[in-house]
Amino acid sequence: MCIRDRAFEILSLYIDDIPAADLRALVRKTYTAEVFGTEAIVPLRGLEDGLYLEALSNGPTLAFKDMAMQLLGNLFEYTLAKQHAELNIFGATSGDTGSAAEYAMRGKKGIRVFMLSPHKKMSAFQTAQMFSLQDPNIFNIAVEGVFDDCQDMVKAVSNDHGFKQKQKILSLIHI
């Protein structure tokens, strides 16, 4: 069974508010060679008899988190379109999860991402990956301080329920 079929079978056990045909289409849209660099999506390589290595880092940010985030971006876009709604995602990151979230949400209609990260506290690769992403709905914000300072800002917004509702904010605390 290919990864697309397996993902659909598992997701369909838990997602009952998206028609099966639509869910299958979203899974097929997500797990493509164009996104993951290979038709196998998660290639399995035999190292020796009975020992295999599965590659989970073929996505756009080279992080295993792309496996879930890419699907999440498509699910968000689908759901928001059905509801004629918009969403502002406000998060904090110290590395690859922020990049995976941004690359998953780039170009998605009705979604904007505001991602805080500690200024000069991430690897050069992670900083370049995030801050070179040019997309009108992705906003990278470098914060003087450490990751905990970024997280504190997200928690403050998360705890202001009136503000979150008015601004249509989904806050992501542990990225």
Predicted regions, residues:
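Conserved small/polar residues in nucleotide/adenosyl-binding loops
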Residues: M1-D5, I173-I175
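N-terminal entrance/gating region of PLP-dependent enzymes' catalytic architecture
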Residues: R4-L62
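Predominant activation on well-ordered alpha-helical scaffold segments within soluble catalytic domains
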Residues: F8, S12, Q70-G73, Q151, ...
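Generic secondary-structure signature for well-ordered alpha-helical cores
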Residues: S12, D16, T32, E77, ...
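Acidic-glycine-rich active-site phosphate/pyrophosphate-binding loop
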Residues: I41-D49, M67-A68, S158-Q165
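Well-ordered mid-protein domain cores that form the structural environment of catalytic cofactors
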Residues: L51-G107
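Glycine/threonine-rich beta-strand-loop-alpha-helix active-site module
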Residues: E86-P136
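Small/polar-residue-rich loop-to-helix segments that shape phosphate-bearing ligand pockets
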Residues: L116-I173
